[in-house]
Regions:
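Membrane-interface "cap" regions at the ends of multi-pass membrane proteins
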Residues: 1-58, 207-214, 232-242, 470-483
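Membrane-interface loop-to-helix entry segments
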Residues: 146-188, 201-204, 245-247, 357-365, ...
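Hydrophobic, small-residue-rich membrane helices and short re-entrant helix-turn-helix hairpins
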Residues: 23-27, 161-174, 225-257, 272-283, ...
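Selective recognition of specific alpha-helical transmembrane segments in multi-pass small-molecule
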Residues: 39-43, 66-74, 109-120, 154, ...
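Juxtamembrane transmembrane-helix boundary signature
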Residues: 63-97, 107-121, 464-471
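Membrane-water interface regions at transmembrane-helix termini and the short interhelical loops
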Residues: 52-53, 80, 96, 104, ...
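Hydrophobic, membrane-embedded alpha-helices of multi-pass small-molecule transporters
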Residues: 27-44, 185-191, 201-265, 287-312, ...
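C-terminal membrane-solvent junction of multi-pass transporters and transport-like membrane proteins
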Residues: 176, 372-461, 476-480
Length: 483
C-alpha cells in the first residue's frame, strides 16, 4: 500500500517485500497496535486463573508480571526481523527453515493465529451478548447471534482493508479503552477486600512456575509468530533497541495493571473467580452498576476485537506464506469464515471455555515456543539484513530445506509435550509422557507446564549452537545493516 493512498483503501501488499518508498513510521508507532491488542478486560481473568494454581496473591503477582514481560520481550526481539527484511514473519523464517521448509512453521502459525482469533472473538461475543441480556434487550440465542454478526463483521472489515486501517484503528482503540478502563478500576475499587490478600496460603515452586509458564503461553508466546508483520513497514535504519522497547512496553504495560487488578478482585470474590472459567468478561462485569455496562462492554469488545483483527490479518499472511495462491483479502475472508464456525461451536455447544482454551494454548504453545527460541537466536546471531530476493527462491542462499532446524523443532516439541499435562481437556491425555522422571502426572511438577519453557530453551540453545555457521554463510557477501 503506498503512502499516498488513504486509510480506507485496501492494502495491496501480500507476502511480498515492502519497497523502500513504502516504508514508513518509527519504532514508537509500534506502541499503538501492541497496546490496543492487549488492553483487554480478558487479561483480568488471568488473575483468577493464576490463583487457581494454588499460590498466594503475591506469588501470583510476581509470576504474572515476569511471565508477561519476558514473553513480550521475545515479541520485541522478533520484531527486529521485520525491519531487517520488510516481509511477514513466516516469510522471514524461510532463512531458518528454508524456503520450502518454512511451510511447516507457517502451517503451525496459521493454526495458532486461527485458534487465537476464535478464542478472542468468542470472548468478545460472550461479553456483548451478556450485556445485551443484562440490559433486557434480548434473551436466549438471539443476543449471541447478533453479537457474532457484529463482532466478526467488524474484524473482517479491518482485516480486509489491511495495515493502514489497522494501525489507525489501534490508535483510536488505545485511547478509548484506556479511558474507560480507568473508569472500571474506580468503580470496582469498592469491591476489593484488602484483608483477603494475605488469607491465601503460599504455594509450591512448581505451582509458581506453572502460573508463570501459563501466562507466558497465554500472552507473549501467543504473539511471537506474527511479531514482524507489524514492524515490516519500518525503514531499515530504525533503531533495534527502539523496536524492542516500544513493542515490549506497549504490549506489557496494560496487561500488568489489568492482571494485578484481576488478582485483587479474584481474591476478594470467590464466586466471581469461579465463574471466570465459563464467561471471563461477564464474570468481571458482575461487580458493575447497570449504567456502566455499556461503556464496559465497549472497552471489553474493542480490546478483544483489536487482538482478533491482528490475528485475522496475520493469519491471512501465514496462509499465503504456506503457498496458497489467493489475494490477501480473500485469505482474510476465509479466516473469518472459519472463525465463525469456531465461535459457534464454543458459544453454543461447549460447556466451558477455559478447558479447551488451556488445551489449545499448551499443545500449540510447545512447538511455537521451540520456533520462537530459534527465531530469537537467529535475530541475535544475524548481523545483516535479509536478502529479500532469496527469501522467495528455493535455489537461493537460504535453500529449500534446513535439516538442522527441523531436528531442533522435532526434539524440542517431543520433549516439550512430554513435560506438559492438561487435565481439563481429555483429548490431551497422551501428553506428559516424560513426567514420570519428576513425580508423574499427579506429582507437584505436573501442573508447572515445564514443557513450554524447555521447548523455548531447546529452540534458543539449539540454534545458538548449531546454526551459527549456516547464518555466517548466508550473510557472507551481504552489506552491513543500517541499524
Amino acid at each position: 500500500m503506498s503512502n499516498e493512498k488513504g486509510t480506507l483503501s485496501i492494502e495491496e501488499q501480500g507476502i511480498d517485500t515492502i519497497s523502500e518508498e513504502e516504508r514508513k513510521g518509527t519504532p514508537a508507532s509500534l506502541f499503538w497496535p501492541w497496546f490496543a491488542a492487549n488492553v483487554s478486560m480478558f487479561a483480568m481473568s488471568y488473575g483468577a486463573w493464576a490463583l487457581g494454581f494454588g499460590i498466594s496473591f503475591w506469588q501470583a503477582t510476581a509470576m504474572t508480571i515476569i511471565g508477561v514481560v519476558i514473553s513480550f520481550l521475545l515479541v520485541g526481539i522478533i520484531s527486529i526481523a521485520g525491519k531487517r527484511g520488510n516481509a511477514p514473519t513466516m516469510v522471514l523464517t524461510r532463512a531458518t527453515f528454508g524456503v520450502e521448509g518454512a511451510k511447516v512453521p507457517a502451517a503451525l502459525s496459521w493454526i495458532a493465529t486461527l485458534g487465537w482469533e476464535i478464542s478472542l472473538t468468542t470472548t468478545a461475543v460472550l461479553a456483548l451478548s451478556s450485556t445485551i441480556e443484562k440490559l433486557g434487550w434480548g434473551s436466549g440465542v438471539a443476543p449471541k447471534i447478533i453479537s457474532t454478526i457484529v463482532v466478526v463483521g467488524l474484524v473482517v472489515v479491518a482485516g480486509i482493508f489491511g495495515y493502514d486501517l489497522i494501525m489507525r484503528c489501534q490508535q483510536v482503540i488505545t485511547i478509548v479503552t484506556g479511558v474507560i478502563t480507568v473508569g472500571f478500576f474506580i468503580l470496582g475499587w469498592g469491591h476489593i477486600d484488602f484483608s483477603a490478600i494475605d488469607s491465601v496460603p503460599a504455594g509450591s515452586l512448581p505451582a509458581m512456575l506453572g502460573c508463570c509458564f501459563f501466562v507466558m503461553t497465554g500472552f507473549g508466546l501467543g504473539w511471537v509468530n506474527i511479531a514482524a508483520d507489524y514492524s515490516r513497514y519500518l525503514p531499515r535504519n530504525s533503531s533495534n533497541g527502539g523496536i524492542v522497547f516500544w513493542t515490549t512496553f506497549g504490549a506489557s504495560i496494560a496487561n500488568v495493571f489489568l492482571i494485578f487488578y484481576g488478582l485483587l478482585l479474584a481474591v476478594s470474590n470467590a464466586d466471581m473467580a469461579e465463574n471466570v472459567g465459563n464467561d471471563p468478561i461477564g464474570a468481571m462485569a458482575s461487580i458493575l452498576p447497570t449504567w456502566y455496562l455499556i461503556p464496559y462492554t465497549i472497552v471489553a469488545v474493542l480490546g478483544l476485537m483489536s487482538g482478533s483483527i491482528m490475528d485475522n490479518y496475520s493469519n491471512g499472511l501465514a496462509l499465503l506464506s504456506f503457498g496458497v495462491k489467493l489475494p490477501r483479502t480473500v485469505a482474510a475472508a476465509l479466516t473469518a469464515a472459519l472463525t465463525v464456525l469456531g465461535v459457534v461451536y464454543v458459544t453454543f455447544f461447549s460447556d466451558t471455555f477455559i478447558g479447551p482454551f488451556q488445551g489449545f494454548l499448551t499443545t500449540l504453545g510447545v512447538p511455537m515456543a521451540v520456533w520462537a527460541g530459534m527465531f530469537v537466536a537467529d535475530v541475535i546471531i544475524r548481523k545483516k539484513d535479509y536478502s529479500t530476493a532469496d527469501l522467495y527462491d528455493p535455489k537461493g542462499r537460504y535453500g529449500a530445506w534446513n535439516g538442522k532446524s527441523f531436528a531442533i523443532l522435532v526434539v524440542g516439541t517431543v520433549l516439550g509435550w512430554g513435560l506438559v499435562v492438561n487435565t481439563a481437556a481429555s483429548w490431551l491425555n497422551w501428553q506428559g509422557y516424560l513426567l514420570f522422571f519428576i513425580g508423574g502426572k499427579e506429582g507437584s511438577w505436573a501442573a508447572a507446564n515445564l514443557g513450554v519453557i524447555v521447548a523455548l530453551i531447546i529452540g534458543l540453545a539449539g540454534s545458538l549452537m548449531f546454526q551459527r555457521g549456516d547464518i555466517a554463510k548466508q550473510e557472507a557477501d551481504l552489506p552491513v545493516s543500517e541499524a
